[in-house]
From Swiss-Prot:
This is Alanine--tRNA ligase. Its main location: cytoplasm. The gene is alaS. It holds the Pfam family tRNA-synt_2c. Consists of three domains; the N-terminal catalytic domain, the editing domain and the C-terminal C-Ala domain. The editing domain removes incorrectly charged amino acids, while the C-Ala domain, along with tRNA(Ala), serves as a bridge to cooperatively bring together the editing and aminoacylation centers thus stimulating deacylation of misacylated tRNAs.
Length: 913
């Protein structure tokens, strides 16, 4: 497949020979005429452990060596992107360096930030989560060093030959011997693209991959190339997409037993000391075992049953039992995994991800809770927040937007939540286990996933609890990896627009001029009707804003000399705006005057602008991690959903309202610019994308003070035009998301006047001044509570009197009381309970606080739940409960007599059965 793509001048000119691996059958290129295997796992074991193949470099030194090398060879160094992929709407985390430039640069919509460029991009992949720590080489968080070139026919940069030349040159710059290097052919495809690629192998380790992306599933009209049974076509853009593993290069330069030893030279001793495992430090026997484990792991896929095979191979090679081996190696694997996870959390939280139960927050919580569990397994005397902050400091605090104290606070909150989750979730797991024991069925995997997803129970603890219940179950070794995979991509399907059926027709209509951007304060305009179909009118230009991004559309009128039609809704399809009218009496070519509903436009514009101000205030009060999770506007009120790790306090809400209004009073100008997407991202960062990711090469950037967003809505021309902002309500709508409801302008004035009216009415009712309301309400409430206690005491005495006066009937040798007693349900329960305690049966009905029924039974012959159900059915209601006590309610008070008779007949029938 693509064999001709590898017949390169670089290989020929430098003496490389194409060979076929005698073990796996793959084609590879080498300078060694005697080499017979490709150099990849599992064909060749690691050769560099204890025998480094590069000059020794720390992680920081290796990164700088790489970036400097490519800078010297004509590449522009660019800063890393965040690990939260907020410029993407399909993935949550940055999984590769090329992801930084997808989809807009790779599709040719936007130019790259530099060409060619070099970057060292932190990436997070959780698909091998369960292998981290075990294999010696897997990480959740790793840095992909890369050099990229974006080639077009008009502007070629470099292609395969130069890329290979640079790769060999970099390896030589590290002291590597190119004679030991192999380039293995391995065509790449994924995400609708494909191309030839080579794996770069040294010492049995894949250190880099060089992909030459030049094919796409999109038909370009050129002859197709078949890959994996699918047709691909030449792309106009040819992309050099490389990935060099920073951690792997560092490992190969140090020759340590595992990659973790090379990457975490400071964190490993700290964790070992905190876990009381200092004896593992610089222990030759432990190092020998770990090195063998890494070598054997490099030759196999260690998921599932393979982990047991790996244990046996290492045990055989070291002449110790598997049990003894696991005593040595399992705690070390946990230490390694904790080192990795804390670095992963440093990037996640440092790059402003907030743990939650959705999106990237879910993945952060998954890693965080695994870390908590690992610390518990190691009996560590250390703080998770301190470990993560220590990793941030090693990386460099300047690399992160989040403050270290907030990171600690977030982690402390998550640890508290975890403890509560375990306590509550344990009972749930026990119930599930008992249910499947009764069914005599194993607990299915789907149920186990639900227990984790909905209740947050770690898989190992889940297994222990289920085992104690006697339930049968099977938890896959890669359970956490499967969970992560389920949540790694945004698979939400966009709803089909009702306009889709008009797509062909709309495609023939010229783009609508968006006059609402040019003249946002104007309320009238002239335009020409371009098309009319169903109840839609298309104009050549419009001031009517179409619905989008949480902002409802404008409404108003379209007027001609002879007719007038009402515009109820405005929508957009690509670049054409459609006005939905009630009665379509217009025709093509008509000149119309558009007249907006002015009060509505101003209310929506004020609320949209106020949303920016409230968001800015939230960031100033709560921290830079605050990110918009959604918004919705109306003329009366607006709401803003934000991501935050804890509940917002009343004091914080007050500060936010003050800051938002201060920004209004500063009368800051609204600056709107159409900017190149890449330049805007470089200038303002990815906080631009608060309301989603707009398409296109250029984006509309709205700046109001320090708040800058890519935003398509209508805005006031200065913050002063917003008017007062009043926060009305705060809701905790889901874990990690707070909803702020507020009003602006005249809507805020109406809200404040309404609140004042309520205060005045309340003050009049209590005959006090408004400023004395809090004290008066407190006094009245205290008196009310005292009186209620007295009433409860009196009711209890009444219930005792009723109990002493009640005479029952004898049915089957049991005292049976069937009566209407008009006391509260609470007293009914007390009376019924006491009769049941002495072995009796009761049915008591009250109309004191609604039509209520209480039944009790002190004998096994009568089930109170069934009894109350029969009685309530007679009353037109429902009821149920336990065997000894049950309650219900009715709807028909006139049926009380019949219900009491029904109770007696049911009890007699039960005794006679």
């Amino acid at each position: 497949m693509l064999e001709n793509e590898y017949q390169l001048e670089y290989f020929k000119e430098n003496g490389f020979i194409r060979k076929i691996c005698k073990k796996c059958g793959s084609a590879f290129w080498t300078l060694d005429p005697n080499r017979e295997i490709c150099g990849d796992a599992p064909c060749e074991p690691y050769q560099f452990i204890g025998n480094p193949i590069f000059t020794k470099h720390s992680l920081t030194e290796m990164r700088e060596a790489y970036l400097s090398f490519f800078e010297r060879h004509g590449h522009t160094r660019i800063n890393r992107y965040p690990v939260a992929a907020r410029w993407r709407d399909d993935i949550y985390l940055t999984i590769a360096s090329i992801a930084d430039f997808q989809p807009f640069v790779t599709s040719g919509v936007c130019p790259p930030p530099a060409n060619p460029l070099t970057i060292s991009q932190p990436c997070i992949r959780l698909n091998d989560l369960d292998n981290v720590g075990r294999s010696g080489r897997h990480f959740t968080c790793f840095e992909m060093m890369a050099h990229h070139a974006f080639n077009t026919d008009e502007k070629p940069i470099y292609w395969k030959d130069r890329c290979l030349e640079l790769c060999s040159g970099f390896i030589e710059s590290l002291g590597g011997n190119v004679f030991d290097l192999t380039y293995k052919e391995n065509p790449w495809f994924g995400g609708g693209n494909a191309g030839p690629s080579v794996e770069v192998l040294m010492g049995g380790l894949e250190v880099a991959t060089l992909v030459f992306m030049n094919l796409s599933r999109k038909n370009s009209g050129k002859p197709p190339v078949s890959i994996d049974g699918k047709d691909y076509y030449e792309m106009p853009l040819r992309i050099v997409d490389t990935g060099y593993g920073l951690e792997r290069f560092t490992w190969a330069s140090c020759g340590t037993p595992t990659a973790y030893d090379a990457v975490f030279p400071e964190m490993i001793p700290r964790i070992l000391t905190a876990a009381g495992m200092e004896d593992r430090l610089e222990n030759p026997e432990v190092e020998r075992i770990l090195g063998l484990n890494a070598k054997f792991a490099g030759l196999m896929d260690i998921r599932g049953e393979k982990i047991r095979d790996l244990r046996q191979q290492v045990a055989d090679a070291t002449n110790i039992s598997v049990a003894k081996l696991e005593e040595i190696i399992v705690p070390m694997e946990t230490v390694y995994a904790l080192c990795d996870h804390t670095r992963c959390l440093a990037y996640m939280l440092g790059d402003l991800i907030v743990p939650s139960n959705v999106r990237e927050g879910y993945l952060a919580r998954l890693v965080l809770r695994r870390s908590i569990r690992m610390m518990q397994d190691l009996n560590m005397d250390d703080d998770l927040g301190d470990l993560v902050v220590s990793q941030m400091k090693t990386i460099g605090l300047a690399n992160f937007e989040q403050d270290e104290d907030i990171v600690r606070h977030i982690i402390n909150r998550e640890v508290e939540k975890y403890d509560t989750t375990i306590e509550r979730g344990t009972r749930t797991v026990q119930r599930v286990g008992q249910t499947y024991v009764k069914k005599n069925e194993p607990v299915p995997l789907a149920e186990l996933i639900t227990l984790y997803d909905s209740h947050g129970i770690p898989v190992d603890l889940m297994g222990k609890i289920l085992k104690d219940t006697g339930a049968e179950f099977e938890i896959p070794d890669d359970f956490d990896s499967q969970i992560a995979d389920m949540h790694s991509e945004n698979e939400t399907e966009k709803p089909v627009s009702p306009l889709a059926k008009y797509a062909e027709r709309i495609a023939k209509i010229p783009e609508t001029r968006k006059s609402f951007y040019e003249r946002p304060a104007d309320m009238e305009f002239d335009a020409t009707v371009l098309d009319i179909f169903d109840n839609y009118v298309v104009l050549d230009a419009t001031l009517f804003y179409p619905e989008g991004g949480g902002q409802p559309s404008d409404t108003g009128m379209l007027v001609t000399k002879s007719t007038m039609v009402r515009v109820d809704e405005v929508v957009k399809w690509e670049n054409v705006i459609l006005h939905k009218v009630r009665e379509n009496t217009l025709k093509r070519g008509d000149r119309v005057k558009g007249v907006l509903d002015e009060d509505r436009r101003w209310a929506l514009m004020r609320h949209h602008s106020a949303t920016h101000m409230v968001l800015r205030a939230a960031k100033e009060v709560l921290g830079p991690h605050v990110h918009q999770a959604g918004s919705q506007l109306s003329t009366d009120v607006a709401r803003l959903d934000i991501r935050h790790y804890t509940h917002i306090t009343p004091e914080e809400l007050k500060q936010m309202e003050t800051i938002a209004n201060r920004l209004v009073m500063e009368n800051l100008p609204t600056m709107v610019k159409i900017e190149n997407r890449v330049k805007a991202e470089q200038k303002f960062g990815f906080a631009l994308y608060q309301g989603g990711v707009p398409p296109g090469k250029d984006i509309r950037v709205v700046q109001m003070g320090a708040e800058v967003q890519a935003c398509a809505g209508t805005h006031c021309q200065s913050t002063g035009e917003i008017g007062p902002i009043k926060i009305l309500k705060l809701e905790h709508i889901q874990d990690g998301v707070e909803r702020i409801e507020f009003a602006a302008g005249f809507a805020a004035l109406d809200a404040m006047q309404h609140i004042q009216s309520l205060l005045n009415t309340s003050a009049d009712t209590l005959s006090v001044q408004t400023e004395n309301l809090p004290g008066s309400v407190d006094r009245f409430f205290t008196e009310w509570k005292d009186q209620r206690k007295e009433i409860e005491k009196l009711r209890a005495k009444i219930a005792e009197l009723e109990l002493s006066r009640i005479e029952g009937i004898n049915i089957g040798g049991v005292e049976v009381v069937i009566k209407q007693i008009d006391v509260s349900r609470k007293e009914l329960v007390t009376v019924a309970g006491k009769i049941a305690e002495r072995g009796g049966v009761t049915v008591l009905i009250t109309t004191a606080d609604g039509l209520g029924v209480v039944a009790s039974s002190g004998t096994g012959k009568i089930h109170a739940g069934k009894l109350v159900g029969e009685v309530c059915a007679e009353l037109g209601g429902k009821g149920g409960g336990k065997e000894n006590l049950a309650q219900g309610a009715g709807a028909d008070p006139s049926a009380v007599g019949k219900a009491l008779l029904k109770a007696e007949s049911f009890i007699r029938a039960e005794f006679n059965s």
